A protein has these predicted regions:
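Bacterial N-terminal signal peptides that target proteins for export
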Residues: 4-27
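C-terminal regulatory/interaction regions
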Residues: 283-326
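Metallo-beta-lactamase
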Residues: 40-45, 139-193, 199, 207-208, ...
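Active-site neighborhood of phospho(di)ester-bond hydrolases with catalytic His/Asp-centered motifs
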Residues: 82-84, 107-115, 133-136, 193, ...
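Divalent-metal (often Zn2+) His-rich catalytic cores of metallo-beta-lactamase-fold enzymes
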Residues: 233-286, 290
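Active-site metal-binding motif and surrounding structural segment of the metallo-beta-lactamase
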Residues: 76-80, 88-134, 244
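N-terminal signal peptide c-region/cleavage motif recognized by signal peptidases
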Residues: 32-37
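Conserved beta-strand hairpin/beta-sheet module of binuclear metal-dependent hydrolase folds
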Residues: 47-98, 202-214
Length: 326
């Protein structure tokens, strides 16, 4: 067969490498993750109440975006899961881990908020026919340009774990007020807590067990990601949570807490420090760089992700306080 406009030649190393570079990178990411990545391993924090803990890190292909927590509660009539982790692969591992713990079927999944590291596993539960519940403000995020842009970026930055098959999944049931249900004798209270970390923040309380599934309202033992959050309302939400009669907290990030008050206060105090230092600078028309350089960060500089998160947290808070300055 004659070929026009092209003269076949034997591939060299230089001509072959670009063709295979993308495939090789993806393969190496899979191999690296399978060897080194943290396992989705449940830990029982109270009888019948389990959690899996993600890494205190930014999401990368190497950690498979396993940087957030999920929890599940085993009852006599089925399992309730809180959050879906940061990729379909992680969600499948979570489903398998639950099956190793109990033969009970998964009945419900509750979304604490629609951030990527908590929701990119939702499609696995959706495809299994599990009822998904979330706060109605999550609908605004799903229909936003930001959600689509974040998913597009994740497909590039977190491949192969987030890919063209990863999709945004709406809840089956949207709630706006305090919602209670009982399964297998266990009472669950879904309490709207936003706008705080996000507009759709939803916490899960198990009153009899004294357990609070706090989502990203609480980052235990690390600097939180503030992003575009209204930190003032976040502080108000934490103050409300401090009035709850709970002994154990499952945070959105970090290990479970049995010192509920202390860990709620750590996140709250960090946010208050941001608002105080950046608020003073904004009111005094002090440039951000100068204000950031002279601020005292010593109480938080030792915490994981301080270098990755603190500066952008401070800058976003500076902009927020600048808008509200008289």
């Amino acid at each position: 067969m004659r070929m026009y406009g092209f003269r076949a030649r034997k591939p060299t190393v230089k001509t072959r490498l670009p063709r295979w570079r993308g495939v090789l990178s993806a393969w190496l990411a899979v191999v690296s993750a399978s060897v080194w990545a943290q396992a989705v391993e449940p830990v029982e924090i109270q009888p019948g109440i389990w959690m899996v803990q993600g890494a205190s890190a930014l999401g990368t292909p190497a950690n498979r975006n396993f940087i957030s927590n999920a929890a599940f509660v085993v009852t006599a009539d089925g399992v309730v899961v809180i959050d879906a982790l940061g990729s379909p692969a992680l969600a499948r591992e979570l489903v398998a881990a639950i099956a190793r713990v109990t033969p009970q079927p998964i009945r419900h999944l509750v979304v604490t908020h629609y951030h990527a590291d908590h929701i990119y596993g939702l499609q696995v539960f959706k495809d299994l026919g599990i009822t998904i519940t979330a706060h109605q403000q999550g609908q605004a995020y799903l229909h936003s340009d930001n959600a689509q842009l974040r998913l597009k970026a994740s497909r590039e930055e977190l491949a192969p774990w987030i890919d063209a098959q990863t999709r945004l999944v709406p809840a089956d049931r949207w709630v706006s007020d305090t919602t209670r249900f009982t399964l297998g004798g266990v009472e669950f209270v879904l309490q709207p807590a936003g706008p705080a970390h996000t507009p759709e923040d939803l916490v899960v309380v198990l009153p009899r067990q004294g357990v609070l599934m706090a989502g990203d309202l609480v980052f235990r033992g690390r600097v939180p990601f503030v992003g575009q959050a209204d930190s003032g309302r976040w502080i108000e939400a934490l103050n409300r949570l401090l009035s709850y009669d709970v002994r154990t907290i499952v945070p959105g990030h970090g290990p479970a807490s049995t010192s509920a008050v202390a860990d709620l206060q750590l996140t709250r105090d960090y946010l208050q420090h941001l608002r105080r230092t950046m608020g003073d600078a904004a009111r005094n028309l002090e440039p951000f760089e100068e204000a950031y350089a002279k601020a005292d960060w010593s109480a938080y500089a030792h915490l994981p992700l301080f270098k990755a998160a603190n500066r952008i947290n401070a800058y976003n808070t500076y902009l927020l306080m600048e808008q509200s300055a008289p």
